[in-house]
Regions:
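Intrinsically disordered, low-complexity acidic/Q/S/K-rich activation/interaction tracts characteristic
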Residues: 1-175, 301, 305-308
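K/R-rich mixed-charge low-complexity regions
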Residues: 172-308
Length: 308
């Protein structure tokens, strides 16, 4: 079965504006969600809440010193294991990572022509914008323009640009969300590689690091050279495999830091947390297996619903 996210569970532009809340488009939100699912501290917080504060002796012994901070994040973000990102986003994520109100955007209030002049109904729609949508977008400075459509795109755009330059104001800054991204400019590919390595290490706990690197596809130079199941280390490939091991080790270390920081409400950050828990691939192998089983059933259910 294809485990790709079903179309009905993919985030659309309209999902960034729901119930008086809005957020900017950012792939980092999805990665935060995915990496929380691979955080040992977050998993322990989930277990603690589900078991009404009761933990085994083993779990008590490994509970981090800042566990209360992790519990606070878990209480906000909730269980991220057995639901699609869209479900989590619409129910929790938007209010945690977004802010009240809409983002300002360019709108066509009405179009007038000789055949269809600016009548009272069109003017009413324009007034309606200023009594509703304008306030919902935080009362931005706006220009009401009459743009002739018969002067050509290039001339019209040039004149509009000149007016914008003439009346430019400070760029809009949305209200600070409850959880703000720690680094909006972090390279997405680097984060995806970290996620892939952490996930693959859990999916294949017996794999050596170079095998994890092959399966995670973190290196254009080395990952494609080897097969994780059939390649054997020898004098001819030892140096290349060593380089891949080093790359995978760095990504694995960074991924553990990112996941544990995410559990403390800090994302994305590769800094080593002061009280991070150890990542146990065997433990998360069971968690991933349960998640895959759930996802297969959920996709099948969605497909059946579409078919009916």
């Amino acid at each position: 079965m294809d485990l790709k996210t079903p179309t009905s569970m993919r985030i659309l532009k309209r999902d960034l504006r729901i119930g008086g809340w809005s957020a900017d488009t950012n792939k980092l939100y999805r990665l935060w969600f995915e990496l929380l699912a691979l955080s040992p501290s977050y998993e322990l917080a989930k277990r603690y809440r589900q078991q009404n504060g009761k933990l085994s002796k083993e779990d008590k012994d490994r509970k981090p010193a800042d566990f209360e901070a992790v519990l606070k994040v878990f209480d906000d973000f909730g269980d991220v294991q057995k639901l699609f990102f869209k479900e989590w986003w619409t129910n929790r994520g938007l209010k945690l990572l977004g802010s009240p109100g809409n983002r300002p955007e360019t709108k066509l209030l009405f179009k007038a022509s000789q055949q269809r002049p600016a009548d009272d109904e069109k003017l009413r729609r324009a007034r309606s914008y200023f009594s509703t949508g304008w306030h919902e977008a935080h009362d931005p400075d706006v220009m009401v323009l009459a743009i002739p459509l018969n002067i050509g795109r290039q001339k019209a755009l040039k004149e509009v640009k000149a007016l914008i330059d003439q009346h430019a104001v400070q760029l809009f800054q949305p209200p600070t969300p409850k959880y703000e991204l720690a680094n909006k400019d972090m390279h997405i590919k680097s984060l995806i590689d970290c996620l892939s390595v952490l996930y693959m290490k859990a999916a294949k706990p017996k794999f050596k690091l170079w095998q994890v690197g092959v399966e995670a596809g973190i290196s254009k130079t080395y990952s494609g050279q080897f097969d994780s199941k059939t390649t054997r280390r020898n004098a001819n490939n030892s140096e290349e495999i060593r380089h891949l091991e080093m790359m995978t080790y760095r990504k694995f270390r960074q991924a553990k830091h990112i996941a544990e920081n995410a559990a403390r409400g800090i994302f994305p950050s590769m800094s080593k947390p002061a009280h991070m828990m150890n990542f146990d691939p065997e433990e998360f192998n069971k968690i991933i297996a349960a998640k895959i089983k759930w996802k297969k059933a959920a996709i099948k259910k969605l497909q059946n619903e579409v078919g009916t």
